[in-house]
């Protein structure tokens, strides 16, 4: 009987192969199954055919969806890799025509440095600014991106004509970080040399998460580990300065206790590192925040054992927001005299150059672009010509928003144009 249905079996298997698209091997397996089990009645054959076809089609649909999903993922991954390749593999790290993200003054906003103006020769423009820097001993730059690694911060700084620069040494908004690679360290140093940057005019900024004034020992220890890691990165890269915000008591302890916690952490970090000066940044006067008054900075420094490795960075926006009026030459000079008498000019290691959106004494940390806030362009004229700010990094942290992506280069040029 089986021989009677042999032609029908073959025809059904051929149709099965054509309709489902399964391999010839599986088709032959089906044929063998029908033949060996002596399925005499065509209803049995068709029933088995239908059952197996349904299972195979289900598997094929799942397979097709899986392949489609994999293709989509591969396409997306390829797109990401392509973008990373553009950023991480320029023709040469020493070339200046790079386009990376650069931070704004706000910790929640970022913007991109635009492609360089093709009409402007960057090397020639940088040379002109460098000549002004040599004559004046004024080192103005900005906080630039280190996206992809610290080695990329150097050409980014060069692109905006910066004579100094700041950067984050790792992701400033996470507690998780990777160690610096040997390659990144070597490339950073190589770029510093090829672009003629002196490490003493590089001012890394600490993570926004660090708060060593916190009375909670677990949180303070976690902050210290982040703090220490940054300083050790400075050691690896050959950077001499490290800037951080003193911190906040969070309303959980007296200011005196918070100051002691900060000083203790600084002392511990100095014992564990070499060659890096820890720079305290003055605060804007926010509630519970330490460092808005010169006396706060004085007390922290007083408790530091190795005073040769501690300093201060004065932020012009923070000064104004904290109640120090610097809008006229006379007022600015008086503020600097007060700083000298309370803290000491010998501790002044850096400046953050920012206008203020907020009023005098507002206690609000709101940076604005130069000459567009409560401080006039004239204010910055006598600031950059001040004898107090010679031979130290002067860093712009003004807002970079959509539509003014080239603001850092413009402001660097503006500041140097204000020199006498």
For the regions a language model picked out, list residue spans one by one:
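Histidine-acidic metal/acid-base catalytic patches
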Residues: 54-55, 88, 107, 115-127, ...
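Short, well-ordered coil/turn segments that N-cap beta-strands
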Residues: 135-140, 162-163, 197-201, 238-240, ...
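Active-site beta-loop-alpha junctions enriched in small/polar residues
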Residues: 143-147, 170-172, 207-209, 247-249, ...
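Short amphipathic alpha-helices and their capping/turn segments at secondary-structure boundaries
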Residues: 151-159, 181-197, 228-233, 265-269, ...
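Conserved, mostly hydrophobic/aromatic
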Residues: 157, 205, 234, 278, ...
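Active-site acidic/histidine proton-transfer and metal-coordination neighborhood
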Residues: 212-311
